Amino acid sequence: METYHLEQAARRRIAGRLLPFVFLLYAIQYVDRVNVSFANLRMSADLGFSDRIFGLGAGIFFVGYVLFEIPGAIIVERWSARKWIARIMISWGIVTVVSGFVHTAHQFYTARFVLGVAEASFFPGMIVYLTHWFRLSDRAKAIAWLMAAVPSASVLGSLLAGWLLSIRWFGMAGWRWLFVVEGIPPVILGIVTLFYLTDRPAQARWLSEAERNWISQELEAETTVKKKIRSYTVWQALSSKRVLMLIVPSVLAQIGAQAVIFWIPTFIKRLSGLPASRVALLVALWGLLGIFGMLLNGWHSDRTGERRWHASVLSTANY
């Protein structure tokens, strides 16, 4: 009974401290990644960009992202999640602010590519970080909390964009302020991350000694079991049939998802003729249901211990 109470106390304390914070970080990251879709409601007209220029600029982000995604995740595992995530946030915040001052297509392409490099490995790094704190039986709920930041960011980002696009401070267009204003929070939160996050349970002064020992032993036991089954190098993992079977549907799903995310504000505006503020409100609506769905799916996956169908059915229904 004493062990049970210790376990429950440790799990609550870890979840209560880490999950709201990583949720906030990912929400801010996602807002900054897709804010260009709302900026485009005014930006392309102001700068004379064609749809081709905007589409290439939106997509070139992922070239930089893919190149540095895996190396960054390895750094999180082998060095320090706290320091690396802080570095990511500060650098992407600065690049986002600078994006508000582009004037040419080449400047736009460069800003998007560098933003991809700056943000690369944030999401996989977060997943790796959560494995340092949550047992396998708790991991789906933790990841669901993280993923719920995406629809939440859609709601927050849409409402904020609707307001920012309507302003014109100091003679500067609202879409420029959209980048500047939304680039400041990650810089601040990056600094906060250095002091707030803890890399490993053994370093957590905010846990009691008994709680630190319990979670460390639980995670170490899981690691030992996995190593006995098989230990993979990075290249072995990337060439694994199971990994490839996950990569292919994920890539296909993201092709559709990112196309919708980057173009839906423009499509709605062209089809409806509504002002930017109304367009932003319509885009925000789907996020409200997404928050509920992700948290419910993660909770039910942990409750039943089933992963495959919870991932595949929801993904198929979504896309």
Regions found by a protein language model. Name each.
Residues G59-I74, A284-N297:
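Central cavity-lining transmembrane alpha-helices of secondary-active solute carriers
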Residues R17-D51, G157, V260-P265:
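Extracytoplasmic
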Residues E77-M89, D302-S315:
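Cytoplasmic membrane-interface "Motif A"-like loop-to-helix N-cap segments
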Residues L67-H106:
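Conserved MFS/SLC helix-loop-helix module at the cytosolic interface between two early adjacent transmembrane helices
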Residues G48, S80, F101-Q107, A118, ...:
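Helix-breaking motifs and short loop linkers at transmembrane-helix boundaries and internal kinks
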Residues V36-S37, W235-N297:
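Extracytoplasmic gate region of multi-pass secondary transporters
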Residues A140-L165, W169, P185-P186:
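Glycine-rich segments within core transmembrane alpha-helices of 12-TM secondary carriers
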Residues A111-A149:
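Cytoplasmic helix-loop-helix junction between adjacent transmembrane helices
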